[in-house]
Amino acid sequence: MIEIESRELADIPVLHAYPVGQKDTPLPCVIFYHGFTSSSLVYSYFAVALAQAGLRVIMPDAPDHGSRFSGDAARRLNQFWQILLQSMQEFTTLRAAIAEENWLLDDRLAVGGASMGAMTALGITARHPTVRCTASMMGSGYFTSLARSLFPPLIPETAAQQNEFNNIVAPLAEWEATNHLEQLSDRPLLLWHGLDDDVVPADESLRLQQALSETGRDKLLTCSWQPGVRHRITPEALDAAVTFFRQHL
């Protein structure tokens, strides 16, 4: 059995799940990030499944999502990449808050996520060596190129607009896989993707697999590709994530 609560950590609304009676017991912990226009509540089945596996789970609401949503859905659609960047930046204070609660067992902290949340997890892993392992479900580590086709912040039609676009996208380069293959390969990494994904193409995960493989950095890499699956989490994907974290965290 498990327990689950809504609360704030570092002023960030989160879902917090853990095995029953172990709220204050140090445990291996997974920070799991949800997808765009969704919320931690919608993705709470990950919290349930991982807590049932004996892990502590923290699921933050992304900026302008869940209980942080401003109510302006049209504006949010143009803020995907800014939201992603802020989510990655918030990891440092979120991790510190978890440690302050004395919730971590032997610093065993992992990250994972789905869609935008998977991008968040990959970016965090690229910059934070304390992350023990990472699960990316239908994500991408190639932010600056994907920003031209997936929820672009604007369609540049003038030199000024191109400059604005570049200013939004440029900070993402510090977090993306292109510049951090070594950091993404020195601990266990799971890539799961539906091969018929119609939002974040499976080629995004396949590209990362190829980059790691071609440079001999795939020894800790686990890949799971599901034919016929579009942009959604399947029972098989959930099982793959739970199995991965149980094995490596």
UniProtKB/Swiss-Prot annotation:
GO MF terms held by the record: hydrolase activity; protein homodimerization activity; serine-type peptidase activity; short-chain carboxylesterase activity
Keyword terms, alphabetized: Hydrolase
Transmembrane intervals: none
Biological process terms in GO annotation: proteolysis
Principal EC category: hydrolase
KW NAD (keyword) present: no
Keyword Hydrolase annotated: yes
Superkingdom of source: Bacteria
EC number, UniProt record: 3.1.-.-
PANTHER family: DIENELACTONE HYDROLASE DOMAIN-CONTAINING PROTEIN-RELATED, POLYKETIDE TRANSFERASE AF380
Job of this protein: Displays esterase activity toward palmitoyl-CoA and pNP-butyrate.
Name of the protein: Esterase YjfP
